[in-house]
Amino acid sequence: MRNFGIILAHTYKNRLMSKAFLISTVITLAFMLVLTNMDPYVNMLRGTSEAFSAAVAGADSIQVSPFDEPIQPSTSFSRRIARNTSLILMEESHLAATQDASGGAWYVEHLTDEIIVCKFKVILILNSVREYTDVIADSIFKLSRGH
């Protein structure tokens, strides 16, 4: 998904500095911070996802933080869950037994590249259509004004 940034930048290049975009981004980040504190169990999912990503990437060691650590001193339950997360991924998902856990990632990259090519073709078509519609609109405007 290395091309995701290219797609995102191209899609939002005109909107990134708009006032509405900045306000919505700030509100979204504030909600994320508040909701993390209101529901610390979501951090358990985040920790599992991070541990899985690290294992797939081939990390030598993985340390998962207790899910309630950002809001309070961790409990014995949260420490046990954090300790067992990597063990569960290793023993039950057999991530340590595979040679290349991300072996099929080339296909996702290929599909992403195809999406980018199709998106740029559509953008080029829309830009050419917009140029023609601008010319037609200008002509109609000039005709309506009697020029």
Swiss-Prot record:
Record-linked InterPro entries? Cbl-dep_enz_cat (IPR016176), MeMalonylCoA_mutase_a/b_cat (IPR006099)
A GO molecular function term, named singly, is: methylmalonyl-CoA mutase activity
Entry-linked Pfam families? MM_CoA_mutase
What does the entry give for GO biological process?
A: propionate metabolic process, methylmalonyl pathway
**Alphabetical list of SUPFAM superfamilies matching this protein:** Cobalamin (vitamin B12)-dependent enzymes (SSF51703)
- On the tree of life, the source organism's domain of life is Bacteria
Q: One GO CC annotation, please?
A: cytoplasm
Listed PANTHER family: METHYLMALONYL-COA MUTASE, MITOCHONDRIAL, METHYLMALONYL-COA MUTASE, MITOCHONDRIAL-RELATED
Q: Which family does it belong to?
A: To methylmalonyl-CoA mutase.
Spell out the protein name for this chain.
Methylmalonyl-CoA mutase homolog
Species per Swiss-Prot/TrEMBL record: Alkalihalophilus pseudofirmus (strain ATCC BAA-2126 / JCM 17055 / OF4)
Q: What is the lineage of its organism?
A: Bacteria, Bacillati, Bacillota, Bacilli, Bacillales
